[in-house]
Amino acid sequence: MRSKGVAMADNVISREPKYVGFWMRLFAFFIDSLILTVIIALILIAIFGRNYIQLSMQGKTLWADILFQVVLPALAAILFWRYRGATPGKMLISARIVDARTFGPPSTGKLVGRYFAYLASIIPLFLGFLWIAFDKRKQGWHDKLAGTVVINVEDED
């Protein structure tokens, strides 16, 4: 496989790639959020009917809320990262998550760590995500903690 300006061999990049910046990653996040919201809403309405919100406010859907709003998004993200290198939103913008040192696929452990490291990026007023806009390699704090970067793979053959 070859990429414009970046030599590829066994899914490892031999030269510095083009990193994906803040605005494109934010766009990908919104796409992923929209897809997940629709899927989760359809599942919850199928299970609880149209009065899901009322039942949720009464505390009658806690198990489903945790399963479908916490566990499902985590599993979906980690599985997409592991098997596709990106979530649907990142695939749409031709981006891929790779190991920051080798530019190859990150280990599953790194990907799980990356997901949970989102908390470090979120808690202090989303500063860990804003960091992407100013970082040389466009890494958020979750990327730095997990040892990953997000690169553009648009020109891959």
Question: Residue locations for each model-derived region?
Answer:
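Membrane-interfacial and juxtamembrane segments of integral membrane proteins
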Residues: R2-D157
